[in-house]
């Protein structure tokens, strides 16, 4: 039986959240492919250019768009929430690669978690804040 030495696969991890979407992001040295839940990024994000540019924007800020493949497991929320969660996860993963990446990413706002979530409905109201129509008589 031969013993093979395997080269360790270098990957950098980052987790992003937005609304109810959670994205677990892996950056692997590659040529700039985006794979989300086993599908090519263009297919998963329905060929929407703004979603794709949001996902790639942290890499483009640092000029590394052709150096790393983005592999994502995204759950919850819709496409917008998932795309922005992926963006945060990519930015966090880039910070683990090199701490000098943190300043330009922070300056662009990629490391800030958007904390806005849907407000809960209250009893006695129709929605979170919408009250039933008031009738004086």
From Swiss-Prot:
Keywords, sorted A to Z: Chloroplast, Plastid, Ribonucleoprotein, Ribosomal protein
One term under GO cellular component: cytosolic small ribosomal subunit
One Pfam family here: Ribosomal_S9
Localization (cell): Plastid, Chloroplast
GO molecular function: RNA binding; structural constituent of ribosome
One Gene Ontology biological process: translation
Lineage: superkingdom: Eukaryota
Main location (coarse class): plastid
Family the UniProt entry places it in: Belongs to the universal ribosomal protein uS9 family.
PANTHER family: RIBOSOMAL PROTEIN S9, SMALL RIBOSOMAL SUBUNIT PROTEIN US9M
Protein's name in the database: Small ribosomal subunit protein uS9c
Annotated organism of origin: Mesostigma viride (Green alga)
């Amino acid at each position: 039986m031969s013993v093979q030495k395997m080269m360790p696969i270098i990957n950098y991890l980052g987790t992003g959240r937005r609304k109810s979407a959670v994205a677990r992001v892996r950056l692997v040295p590659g040529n700039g492919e985006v794979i989300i839940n086993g599908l090519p990024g263009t297919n998963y994000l329905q060929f929407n250019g703004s979603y794709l540019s949001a996902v790639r924007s942290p890499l483009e800020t640092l000029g590394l768009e052709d150096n790393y493949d983005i592999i994502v497991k995204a759950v919850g929320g819709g496409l917008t929430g998932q795309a922005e969660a992926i963006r945060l996860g990519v930015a966090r993963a880039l910070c683990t690669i090199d701490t000098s990446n943190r300043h330009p990413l922070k300056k662009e706002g990629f490391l800030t978690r958007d904390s806005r979530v849907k407000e809960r409905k209250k009893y006695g109201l129709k929605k979170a804040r919408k009250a039933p129509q008031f009738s004086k008589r």
